[in-house]
Amino acid sequence: MAVKIRLTRMGSKKKPFYRINVADSRAPRDGRFIETVGTYNPLVAENQITIKEDRVLEWLSKGAQPSDTVRNILSKAGVMAKFHDQKFSK
Protein backbone atom coordinates (compact mmCIF):
# COMPACT_ATOMS: atom_id res chain seq x y z
CA MET A 1 0.00 0.00 0.00
CA ALA A 2 1.55 3.31 -1.12
CA VAL A 3 0.92 5.98 1.49
CA LYS A 4 0.90 9.72 0.84
CA ILE A 5 0.74 12.76 3.10
CA ARG A 6 -1.60 15.21 1.39
CA LEU A 7 -4.17 17.95 1.87
CA THR A 8 -7.91 17.34 2.31
CA ARG A 9 -10.13 20.33 1.57
CA MET A 10 -12.59 21.37 4.27
CA GLY A 11 -14.59 24.54 4.94
CA SER A 12 -17.23 26.17 2.79
CA LYS A 13 -17.35 27.68 -0.68
CA LYS A 14 -14.69 30.40 -1.15
CA LYS A 15 -13.42 29.84 2.43
CA PRO A 16 -11.27 26.72 2.39
CA PHE A 17 -9.03 25.29 5.04
CA TYR A 18 -7.15 22.04 4.77
CA ARG A 19 -6.34 19.05 6.92
CA ILE A 20 -2.98 17.37 6.43
CA ASN A 21 -3.87 13.69 6.19
CA VAL A 22 -2.01 10.43 5.72
CA ALA A 23 -3.93 8.39 3.15
CA ASP A 24 -3.60 5.52 0.71
CA SER A 25 -2.57 6.95 -2.64
CA ARG A 26 -5.53 5.27 -4.38
CA ALA A 27 -8.13 6.92 -2.11
CA PRO A 28 -9.94 10.05 -3.36
CA ARG A 29 -8.72 13.49 -2.25
CA ASP A 30 -11.52 13.99 0.28
CA GLY A 31 -12.11 10.28 0.87
CA ARG A 32 -10.72 7.71 3.29
CA PHE A 33 -7.62 8.51 5.25
CA ILE A 34 -5.49 6.79 7.87
CA GLU A 35 -4.64 9.66 10.21
CA THR A 36 -4.89 13.46 10.46
CA VAL A 37 -1.49 14.94 11.31
CA GLY A 38 -2.17 18.68 11.01
CA THR A 39 -4.14 21.59 9.59
CA TYR A 40 -3.42 24.46 7.21
CA ASN A 41 -5.45 27.67 6.87
CA PRO A 42 -4.33 29.79 3.88
CA LEU A 43 -6.87 32.58 4.50
CA VAL A 44 -5.27 33.87 7.70
CA ALA A 45 -2.64 36.56 7.17
CA GLU A 46 0.20 34.35 8.48
CA ASN A 47 -1.06 31.06 6.97
CA GLN A 48 -1.88 29.29 10.22
CA ILE A 49 -0.28 25.84 10.32
CA THR A 50 -0.51 23.20 13.06
CA ILE A 51 1.48 19.99 12.70
CA LYS A 52 1.99 16.92 14.91
CA GLU A 53 5.73 16.73 14.21
CA ASP A 54 6.30 13.38 15.91
CA ARG A 55 3.57 11.68 13.86
CA VAL A 56 4.73 13.26 10.59
CA LEU A 57 8.33 12.17 11.24
CA GLU A 58 7.13 8.65 12.02
CA TRP A 59 5.13 8.42 8.78
CA LEU A 60 8.01 9.84 6.74
CA SER A 61 10.39 7.29 8.27
CA LYS A 62 7.92 4.53 7.33
CA GLY A 63 8.10 5.66 3.70
CA ALA A 64 5.08 7.94 3.26
CA GLN A 65 5.54 10.37 0.36
CA PRO A 66 4.38 13.98 0.89
CA SER A 67 2.65 15.81 -1.96
CA ASP A 68 4.46 18.84 -3.39
CA THR A 69 2.31 21.32 -1.44
CA VAL A 70 2.64 19.39 1.82
CA ARG A 71 6.41 19.15 1.29
CA ASN A 72 6.55 22.96 1.01
CA ILE A 73 4.41 23.39 4.15
CA LEU A 74 6.58 20.94 6.11
CA SER A 75 9.75 22.65 4.89
CA LYS A 76 8.52 26.05 6.10
CA ALA A 77 7.66 24.49 9.47
CA GLY A 78 11.13 22.92 9.73
CA VAL A 79 9.92 19.32 9.76
CA MET A 80 11.70 18.27 6.57
CA ALA A 81 15.03 19.51 7.95
CA LYS A 82 14.49 17.43 11.11
CA PHE A 83 13.62 14.41 8.96
CA HIS A 84 16.76 14.90 6.86
CA ASP A 85 18.94 15.15 9.98
CA GLN A 86 17.25 12.10 11.51
CA LYS A 87 17.65 10.08 8.31
CA PHE A 88 21.34 10.84 7.74
CA SER A 89 22.54 10.93 11.36
CA LYS A 90 22.82 7.14 11.50
Swiss-Prot record:
GO terms for cellular component: cytoplasm; small ribosomal subunit. One of its GO terms (biological process) is translation. Keywords: Ribonucleoprotein, Ribosomal protein. InterPro entries: Ribosomal_bS16, Ribosomal_bS16_dom_sf. The keyword Acyltransferase does not apply. GO terms for molecular function: structural constituent of ribosome. Pfam families: Ribosomal_S16. Signal peptide: none annotated. Belongs to the bacterial ribosomal protein bS16 family. NCBIfam families: S16. This is Small ribosomal subunit protein bS16. It comes from Streptococcus pyogenes serotype M1. The gene is rpsP.
